[in-house]
Amino acid sequence: MDSTSSLHGSSLHRPSTEQTRTDFSWDGINLSMEDTTSILPKLKRNSNAYGIGALAKSSFSGISRSMKDHVTKPTAMGQGRVAHMIEWQGWGKAPTIQPQHSHEAVRRDTDAYSDLSDGEKEARFLAGVMEQFAISEATLMAWSSMDGEDMSVNSTQEPLDCNYSDNYQELMESQDALAQAPMDGWPHSYVSQGMYCLGSSDAWEASDQSLIASPATGSYLGPAFDDSQPSLHDMGPSQPASGYSAQEPPPLLGVDTDWASEVGGVELARGPVEEEKRPLAPEEEEDAGCRDLESLSPREDPEMSTALSRKVSDVTSSGVQSFDEEEGDANN
């Protein structure tokens, strides 16, 4: 086979040997009709997956560019036109009473929109988009502000609950500590402060816990005074306080109606007989009983005792004070 004839691509006969299998050659590139891979430019005949992937990628890039130029842009313009029509017609607004010839108004609006230039259409489209963004942002800000208010309310309620629980716990602990305190010492302190007036001498016995008044109750209602105890009239001048045991102190002011029988023992020890037998008014007896309780309490300075007695006497009502004044005038 002549080399010149092979360069010009003119072959007169087909050789039978496999070495001269390619019949045509053009610009140094061998072409074979039997090998289809030879049509790929600048690729080997035995092309691998990399070459196929590169071809697919380039093909996809070209196809996507073509789609963008011929399909995407017109579709986007069409969607923009729909958005323009939505904003133009005000479909998102509340429904209003439509006139009889509403289709004519729609047609006029459509014609007016069609008469707009591309710049005006784009401007209207951007205005509509910005309006929607503004509405969405305002809505999100409103929701976030509501969430913030809820969080602030919860945060303010939580410390209040904590403070309430702490105060309640402190109150319970103080009550427990007061209940566990020695019971034989509290009447003296409370009576010295002018807060309590006990009913009978049984309250001073620490052995019987059921008869001891609790500070939380605010008052003491002891058992009824025993009738077997000698009264004021039965006891003579020679028996000042012989009817009572040595361990048991004289009876104190109580809640019974027989005031003279309860205060008699204490008064006999402190004053003459004729002064004790003089009938006392209930108000005077109450003041005398409180003074006796103050004498039983631990002694303090005279000024403090005077202030405490004044505090106890101030508990009486205005009517009682007026009654005392009238009785003093009558005695004078």
From Swiss-Prot:
Basic and acidic residues composition bias: residue spans: 101-111, 272-281, 288-302
Annotated InterPro entries: FAM131
Q: Which residues carry this modification: Phosphoserine?
A: S47, S114, S117, S295, S297, S313, S317, S318, S322
**Which keywords label this protein?**
Phosphoprotein
Say which domain of life the source belongs to: Eukaryota
Task: Region Disordered: list its residue ranges.
Answer: 1-22, 95-114, 221-332
Query: In which residue ranges is the amino acid composition biased (Acidic residues)?
Result: 323-332
Phosphoprotein as UniProt keyword: yes
Query: What's this protein's name?
Result: Protein FAM131B
Gene assigned in the entry: Fam131b
